[in-house]
From Swiss-Prot:
One of its GO terms (cellular component) is plasma membrane. It comes from the Bacteria. GO terms for biological process: defense response to virus. It comes from Gulbenkiania mobilis. Pycsar (pyrimidine cyclase system for antiphage resistance) provides immunity against bacteriophage. The pyrimidine cyclase (PycC) synthesizes cyclic nucleotides in response to infection; these serve as specific second messenger signals. The signals activate the adjacent effector, leading to bacterial cell death and abortive phage infection. A clade C Pycsar system. It holds the Pfam family PycTM. This is Pycsar effector protein GmPycTM. The chain crosses the membrane at residues 34-54, 82-102, 176-196. It is a multi-pass membrane protein. Keywords: Antiviral defense, Cell inner membrane, Cell membrane, Membrane, Nucleotide-binding, Transmembrane, Transmembrane helix. InterPro entries: PycTM.
Length: 196
């Protein structure tokens, strides 16, 4: 690469700042999506546990299971067992979905997990390291920082936040996939409840 095509230090810093802003936007975007998914899961669970039709059907299911005896028709026993299995599957899918979504929503500020050469560990940009300093110490760090160290700090934050963003979206996507599966099972379960 020729020297005239290389970015200057100020251009590198500006690009890093813009990239960091974009990544932070995507992190915020993912948190918003997770919040909407959690709200949907809450509505689904709220509807499940507060609906008179569903609670009535659950009571009928439990009563039907308790009253199974040698005179109960085989198909009725099978239907009650399958309905119970579908109910358990719905609950498990919902728990898995909520676990992924809450893990995605959880903040991650442990920079200790990012141990790579040249990665800035004493950042003047990251609130987690700033809050560990006194104001005087932080102020002196900002005043005394060299240009190349500041650029490295920005690039480090871009790298770390990219990792955080990727983790959030991975957990969000898994959570949504499990939520979709639990919604489908919820619909099937409601259909099965109609025939109890």
């Amino acid at each position: 690469m020729s020297e005239e095509n290389k970015l200057s230090e100020s251009e590198i810093k500006e690009e890093a700042v813009q990239t960091l802003e974009r990544i932070n936007f995507w992190i915020s975007n993912c948190d918003t999506k997770i919040s909407f998914s959690l709200a949907f899961a809450g509505i689904l669970l709220g509807g499940f546990f507060s609906s008179g039709i569903i609670t009535g059907s659950l009571n009928k299911l439990m009563k039907g299971l308790k009253e199974i005896d040698k005179d109960t028709p085989y198909l009725k026993i099978q239907y009650l067992e399958i309905t119970t299995i579908v109910l358990v599957v719905f609950i498990i899918l919902m728990i898995v979905s909520l676990t992924y979504l809450f893990r995605g929503k959880k903040g991650s500020i442990d920079t200790g997990v990012f141990n790579e050469a040249d990665l800035s560990k004493d950042s003047i940009l990251f609130f987690g390291t700033i809050q560990n300093k006194s104001f005087i110490s932080f102020k002196n760090s900002v005043i005394e920082i060299k240009k190349d160290d500041l650029v490295n700090d920005y690039l480090s934050q871009v790298y770390i936040n990219s990792k955080i963003c990727n983790r959030k979206f991975t957990l969000y996507n898994k959570g949504v996939n499990w939520l979709i599966a639990s919604t489908i099972v919820f619909i099937i379960l409601n259909g099965m409840f109609l025939f109890l």
